[in-house]
Protein backbone atom coordinates (compact mmCIF):
# COMPACT_ATOMS: atom_id res chain seq x y z
CA UNK A 1 0.00 0.00 0.00
CA UNK A 2 1.51 3.32 1.13
CA UNK A 3 4.81 3.79 2.96
CA UNK A 4 4.41 7.32 4.34
CA UNK A 5 1.04 8.74 5.34
CA UNK A 6 0.48 12.21 6.78
CA UNK A 7 -2.62 12.54 8.91
CA UNK A 8 -3.35 16.11 10.01
CA UNK A 9 -5.50 16.09 13.14
CA UNK A 10 -7.03 18.60 15.50
CA UNK A 11 -6.27 17.19 18.93
CA UNK A 12 -8.89 19.51 20.39
CA UNK A 13 -11.60 17.92 18.16
CA UNK A 14 -10.60 14.27 18.18
CA UNK A 15 -13.98 12.99 16.96
CA UNK A 16 -13.06 14.30 13.49
CA UNK A 17 -10.22 11.80 13.37
CA UNK A 18 -11.98 8.59 14.43
CA UNK A 19 -12.99 7.44 10.94
CA UNK A 20 -9.82 8.81 9.39
CA UNK A 21 -7.78 6.60 11.75
CA UNK A 22 -9.30 3.43 10.27
CA UNK A 23 -8.62 4.60 6.72
CA UNK A 24 -5.04 5.57 7.52
CA UNK A 25 -4.46 2.16 9.13
CA UNK A 26 -5.85 0.42 6.06
CA UNK A 27 -3.53 2.38 3.77
CA UNK A 28 -0.54 1.61 6.01
CA UNK A 29 -1.33 -2.13 6.17
CA UNK A 30 2.00 -3.70 5.31
CA UNK A 31 4.73 -1.55 6.78
CA UNK A 32 3.59 2.02 6.25
CA UNK A 33 4.26 4.77 8.76
CA UNK A 34 1.53 7.20 9.82
CA UNK A 35 2.64 10.70 10.74
CA UNK A 36 0.06 12.34 13.01
CA UNK A 37 0.35 16.09 12.59
CA UNK A 38 -1.21 18.81 14.70
CA UNK A 39 -0.70 22.37 13.46
CA UNK A 40 -0.95 25.30 15.85
CA UNK A 41 -1.54 28.82 14.52
CA UNK A 42 1.61 30.77 13.68
CA UNK A 43 2.97 33.13 16.29
CA UNK A 44 1.59 36.61 16.63
CA UNK A 45 4.50 37.58 18.87
CA UNK A 46 6.10 39.71 16.17
CA UNK A 47 3.30 42.24 16.41
CA UNK A 48 2.98 41.99 20.18
CA UNK A 49 6.49 42.89 21.38
CA UNK A 50 5.29 43.87 24.85
CA UNK A 51 3.69 40.48 25.32
CA UNK A 52 6.24 38.33 23.48
CA UNK A 53 7.30 36.35 26.58
CA UNK A 54 3.69 35.64 27.52
CA UNK A 55 2.86 34.60 23.96
CA UNK A 56 5.87 32.26 23.93
CA UNK A 57 4.82 30.68 27.23
CA UNK A 58 1.28 30.22 25.93
CA UNK A 59 2.59 28.64 22.69
CA UNK A 60 4.80 26.28 24.73
CA UNK A 61 1.77 25.31 26.82
CA UNK A 62 -0.31 24.65 23.68
CA UNK A 63 2.52 22.64 22.13
CA UNK A 64 2.92 20.50 25.25
CA UNK A 65 -0.85 19.92 25.44
CA UNK A 66 -0.98 18.98 21.74
CA UNK A 67 1.93 16.53 22.14
CA UNK A 68 0.20 14.90 25.11
CA UNK A 69 -3.07 14.55 23.20
CA UNK A 70 -1.28 13.15 20.14
CA UNK A 71 0.26 10.45 22.34
CA UNK A 72 -3.23 9.62 23.62
CA UNK A 73 -4.44 9.41 20.03
CA UNK A 74 -1.71 6.86 19.20
CA UNK A 75 -3.55 4.50 21.56
CA UNK A 76 -6.62 4.60 19.28
CA UNK A 77 -4.72 2.85 16.50
CA UNK A 78 -4.54 -0.92 16.22
CA UNK A 79 -1.20 -0.99 14.38
CA UNK A 80 2.17 -1.13 16.13
CA UNK A 81 2.75 2.23 17.87
CA UNK A 82 6.33 2.27 16.53
CA UNK A 83 4.79 2.87 13.08
CA UNK A 84 3.07 6.06 14.26
CA UNK A 85 5.06 9.27 14.57
CA UNK A 86 3.73 12.47 16.10
CA UNK A 87 4.49 16.04 15.06
CA UNK A 88 3.40 19.43 16.37
CA UNK A 89 4.21 22.41 14.18
CA UNK A 90 3.28 26.08 13.94
CA UNK A 91 1.88 27.70 10.81
CA UNK A 92 -1.05 27.19 8.45
CA UNK A 93 -2.33 23.64 8.05
CA UNK A 94 -2.09 23.69 4.25
CA UNK A 95 1.50 25.00 4.22
CA UNK A 96 2.74 22.69 6.96
CA UNK A 97 1.14 19.64 5.30
CA UNK A 98 2.87 20.48 2.01
CA UNK A 99 6.22 21.15 3.72
CA UNK A 100 6.00 17.91 5.65
CA UNK A 101 4.98 16.03 2.52
CA UNK A 102 8.18 17.16 0.84
CA UNK A 103 10.36 16.51 3.91
CA UNK A 104 9.08 12.96 4.32
CA UNK A 105 8.53 12.21 0.63
CA UNK A 106 5.00 11.26 1.69
CA UNK A 107 2.65 9.20 -0.46
CA UNK A 108 -0.74 10.47 0.72
CA UNK A 109 -2.56 12.73 3.17
CA UNK A 110 -5.54 11.34 5.10
CA UNK A 111 -7.71 14.02 6.70
CA UNK A 112 -11.03 13.95 8.51
CA UNK A 113 -13.75 16.42 7.62
CA UNK A 114 -16.83 17.57 9.46
CA UNK A 115 -20.34 17.46 8.11
CA UNK A 116 -21.01 20.11 5.48
CA UNK A 117 -22.28 23.49 6.47
CA UNK A 118 -23.00 26.67 4.62
CA UNK A 119 -19.73 28.25 5.76
CA UNK A 120 -17.40 25.37 4.87
CA UNK A 121 -19.29 24.16 1.80
CA UNK A 122 -18.46 20.47 1.36
CA UNK A 123 -15.35 20.23 3.53
CA UNK A 124 -14.15 21.73 6.78
CA UNK A 125 -12.06 24.81 6.22
CA UNK A 126 -8.74 23.06 6.98
CA UNK A 127 -9.59 20.01 4.88
CA UNK A 128 -10.72 22.25 2.05
CA UNK A 129 -7.52 24.28 2.17
CA UNK A 130 -5.36 21.14 2.23
CA UNK A 131 -7.20 19.70 -0.78
CA UNK A 132 -6.97 22.93 -2.79
CA UNK A 133 -3.26 23.41 -2.19
CA UNK A 134 -2.00 19.84 -1.86
CA UNK A 135 1.08 18.72 -3.71
CA UNK A 136 0.27 15.05 -3.10
CA UNK A 137 -2.90 12.90 -3.10
CA UNK A 138 -5.44 13.61 -0.35
CA UNK A 139 -8.06 11.23 1.03
CA UNK A 140 -10.84 13.11 2.82
CA UNK A 141 -12.80 10.99 5.29
CA UNK A 142 -16.23 11.92 6.66
UniProtKB/Swiss-Prot annotation:
Pfam family of the protein (one): Usp
Gene: uspG
Database matches in PANTHER family: STRESS RESPONSE PROTEIN NHAX, UNIVERSAL STRESS PROTEIN UP12
Gene3D superfamilies in alphabetical order: HUPs (3.40.50.620)
Stored SUPFAM superfamilies: Adenine nucleotide alpha hydrolases-like
Lineage: Bacteria, Pseudomonadati, Pseudomonadota, Gammaproteobacteria, Enterobacterales
Family assignment from sequence similarity: Belongs to the universal stress protein A family.
Protein name from the UniProt record: Universal stress protein G
Amino acid sequence: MYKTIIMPVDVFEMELSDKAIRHAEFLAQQDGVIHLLHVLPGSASMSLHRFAADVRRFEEHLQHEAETRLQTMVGHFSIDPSRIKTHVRFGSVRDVVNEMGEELDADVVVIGSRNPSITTHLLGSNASSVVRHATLPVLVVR
